[in-house]
Amino acid sequence: EGEFGNFCAGGDIRFFYNAAISGDRDLDTFFTEEYKLNHLIFNYPKPYIAFMDGIVMGGGMGISQGASLRVVTERSKVAMPETNIGLFPDVGGGYFLPKCPGFIGEYLGLTGKVLTGQQALAANLADFAINSDGLANLWAILESKTETAQDKLEKCVQTIRLGSLKKDEGWIDTEIHSTFENEELSTIMRILEKSESDWAKKTYLMLSKRSPLM
């Protein structure tokens, strides 16, 4: 959990650019350490809770998707936006995006679409959605010095369940699966270009501004 309302927006793109141009070896060190951290989180033996409040993008997804419990709020903005700068979803995106229902992962990975907390819940990128005004109480439960770790964890989960919000599936257009089930990007673009639906037109324009590979 970062400061309430700000989880993690990912890496410093300006640093990446300057380091690549100058040949700074710190760039290699950064990615090595980042991926080691992601691997550690995904394999961590103890309960790991990610309070995904606010912006959760790129690297923020890398340190949250391996959590035992992923909690979003009404302020959450969840995305893997790498194609916006001509890159591809990294930090484990190739592992957790395919776990989304149907072909939603392919859609999110290629478009970089930003989801709300309840939309992320529908995409299996979160376990619970709650109102952000309940976060302070959850922290107080976890910081208690009078209960065992197991008791605190169970009480925290129970509190989250009682205040949980419903998932939002309204954004999942029926065309997502029939379009993004295709393995070739050229096929996806051709289908979108020929479609008359508003969703297809918006998605085509969106992809046209993403990675030059598209």
Q: Model features per residue range: what roles?
A:
Residues 12, 47, 64, 120, ...:
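Terminal peptide-recognition signature
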Residues 41-85, 108, 112, 117:
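Glycine-rich beta-to-alpha active-site loop
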